[in-house]
Amino acid sequence: MVWRFQKHIGKGSSQERPIRKDFLTGTAGRDGDRGWGKWWGTALNFPKDPKGSAEGSAPTPLTEGSLPTVGNAPETQPTRRRGAGQRHCNQKPKAGRHFQTLGQPLVGTPPSPQDAAPRQGSPGPGPARTTAVWRPAPSGAAAEHGQKPQTPSASLQPPFPPPPPPGDPTPPSPLPPAHVPPTLLTLQEPVTGEGTSFRVEGLCASRLAVGRGLGALAANTSAPAAGSPLAAAAAAAAAVSSSKFP
């Protein structure tokens, strides 16, 4: 194994070997030649004039009214920088055109010549084809004062009775009919105007059937007027109680 390496080294230096073409860079050179090998001295890594490029390019002379340029940038195209909000300004649609439908002009804009021209099968010219929004016209009084017209639901409601005038007293409560005779158990005020005595007498007369003692007490305490129907009813109730309870 050792004599093979010695034989390979003893053939000669790399400069005596045949010239090979590098397929990576397209340049012709010898193996191991650092001057014009794979990575050194190729056209991709070095310019045509390395010495002139190392010194730097000559500055561009400035004239009156001209702007300085960087490198080989032309003066006709100045550099522009846009912010984040100005990046897509030119690509946005115009306001109001996004929702426009075909054949319907925008509200408040005159119709285009294509819409104004009559079309085949249309009854009239183009401006008559625009859609109009119907709104109920307000009444004269509401239009003068700038008020909204009343809705139909509000107009169908029954009107309320007019309030009484401030000087008019409240109407009296209705009285019972005069042809109905007052009974002993009636709790309303009597028509004759006797007051609460009639109510007390009626209540006492209704309790006379409970016992003779209560009936006598009621007859003594009530003392109705002579000749009144209440006195006759009290006397009859006292007679019945005395006959049942001797």
Swiss-Prot record:
Q: Where is the composition biased (Pro residues)?
A: 158-180
Origin, by domain of life? Answer: Eukaryota
Protein name, as recorded: Putative uncharacterized protein NEXN-AS1
Q: Where is this region: Disordered?
A: 1-184
- Which residues fall in a compositionally biased region of kind Basic residues? 1-10, 79-97
